[in-house]
Amino acid sequence: MSKVYVVAAKRTAIGSFLGTLSPLKPGELGAKVVKNIIEETGIDPANIDEVIVGNVLSAGQAQGVGRQVAIKAGIPYEVPAYSINIICGSGMKSVITAFSNIKAGEADLVIAGGTESMSGAGFILPGAIRGGHKMADLTMKDHMILDALTDAYHNIHMGITAENIAEKYNITREEQDAFALDSQKKAIAAVDSGRFKDEIVPVVIPNKKGDITFDTDEYPNRKTDLEKLAKLKPAFKKDGSVTAGNASGLNDGASFLLLASEEAVKKYNLKPLVEIVSTGTGGVDPLIMGMGPVPAIRKALKKADLKLQDMQLIELNEAFAAQSLGVIKELCTEHGVTADWFKDKTNVNGGAIALGHPVGASGNRITVTLIHEMKKTGVEYGLASLCIGGGMGTALVLKNVK
């Protein structure tokens, strides 16, 4: 079977909720990144075999967000394109699907990523209204809360699953706040030093007062500190420990990779960035959905015949500080490493608590960031993983191509 390479990895800067990117629909956001990838690689879009797009909040965004991305990016009608929705894992599952298709010999060049406008999520009326509503009030549901942030099996917010992990692993509020502040500090340092410049595609947003070029992550909180974090009230549970300050945000953004087989790399004279060595997808109890990376990482490492200790850089999506700390504790126990070892290699440029979590794009965003950091530092192996609402996780093991 062919090796699978990533030959391009790009994303938008991440926008705040109702922030700079909010005027753009997810199809438009994604298309801007895909178009940039095509231009930078010089690949003829007609040679792309398929486009796979993770997207969670599709209701009201018109037919086929994945297809919208492809057509708006100038990819010919003859190239198939489709969407994938496994909640937060969508942007990474698109990569896993592309990887599998190339391995199976069904494709040679695949664009895979994710796009999300949480700002653009609509409100939903119950389907029963189609049968006639004779009297009494009607309640609209928030598409974002219902379809991205609420557990379908216990009708609880994702924040409660983080509270469950905090309780199970005895993770204190102080530990969570310290973790969150560390994420903010690292992200701000990365933004200010231009660390993300190579991975970000500038997005031009039409404005009556003049077009805006958006090329810098706008979500990091420069005004926070431990004292301010400590004053925040629990967001999901009375006397709980999960707050708006130690959880990820609601965000907009898009992120994509171009994957290629060995044959395509040679045929089109492409330059590989990394090889995708293995993938993993696993499941856990939905009540502790944030622990999903643990089985996913276990599977990915086993397939790669590698140990956690072989990973020199790790991107772990920070849905919640409690969730991340729970995963770190479990992985340290399972793989015989210390918490300090793990934290030194993980999210070195900050994570979703600081940068944001556009749900359909995040799994791809952490992969893009990991790839660029691997190229900058020259490390051999990297690992990316994230949790998924409903109790799952996905993971990728990457190898630097030097």
For every predicted segment, state its role.
Residues 1-24, 36, 140, 226-291, ...:
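Condensing-enzyme catalytic core mediating Claisen C-C bond formation in acyl metabolism
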Residues 1-61, 65-73, 80, 161-173, ...:
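Conserved active-site "lid/cap" helical segment
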Residues 10-12, 23-32, 40, 175-267, ...:
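N-terminal extracellular/periplasmic Venus flytrap/periplasmic-binding protein-like
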Residues 55-109, 153-157, 223-249, 334-365, ...:
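Conserved catalytic cysteine-centered active-site region
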Residues 84-116, 166-195, 256-263, 328, ...:
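Active-site-proximal alpha-helical scaffold in enzymes
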Residues 109-164:
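Flexible glycine-/small-residue-enriched beta->alpha junction loops
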Residues 161-163, 199, 207, 277, ...:
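Active-site pocket-lining segment
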